Amino acid sequence: MAENQYYGTGRRKSSTARVFIKAGSGKIVINQRSLEQYFGRPTARMVVRQPLELVEMTEKLDLYITVNGGGISGQAGAIRHGITRALMQYDETLRSELRKAGFVTRDARKVERKKVGLHKARKRPQYSKR
């Protein structure tokens, strides 16, 4: 591992992201592809950049990310969580700012399981009084 490389693991829904940060020019590589190639949706790209824009380090750090599991939204959230954790390892003084923005807290919401006798997690069969 490089001497000044920082690491953070992020999770959201069923996605897991491993984020490596080092000083550089602002290059973001996700699963050997650029941010623009990996995420087609502008909202997902925005979510990924949020912690960097908050601490104004968009052009100062290079990010190497591997992410797997889940869909686009979950992966973007996992990457954001991972970047936040790596930034805190890089500079602990950023923690309060990132916490205020709500990036430090792991979003614990997951898909609710389907129950027996119901169509979905909460959708019940139609009720007939007579």
Swiss-Prot record:
Keyword match Transmembrane: no
One term of GO molecular function: structural constituent of ribosome
InterPro entries listed in its UniProt record: Ribosomal_Su5_D2-typ_SF, Ribosomal_uS9, Ribosomal_uS9_bac/plastid, Ribosomal_uS9_CS, Ribsml_uS5_D2-typ_fold_subgr
Pfam family membership, one: Ribosomal_S9
UniProt KW Ribonucleoprotein keyword: yes
Keyword terms: Ribonucleoprotein, Ribosomal protein
Superkingdom in the source lineage: Bacteria
GO biological process: translation
GO CC, any one term: cytosolic small ribosomal subunit
SUPFAM superfamilies: Ribosomal protein S5 domain 2-like
PANTHER family (alphabetical): RIBOSOMAL PROTEIN S9, SMALL RIBOSOMAL SUBUNIT PROTEIN US9M
Family note: Belongs to the universal ribosomal protein uS9 family.
Name of this protein: Small ribosomal subunit protein uS9
Species: Aeromonas hydrophila subsp. hydrophila (strain ATCC 7966 / DSM 30187 / BCRC 13018 / CCUG 14551 / JCM 1027 / KCTC 2358 / NCIMB 9240 / NCTC 8049)
Gene that produces this protein: rpsI
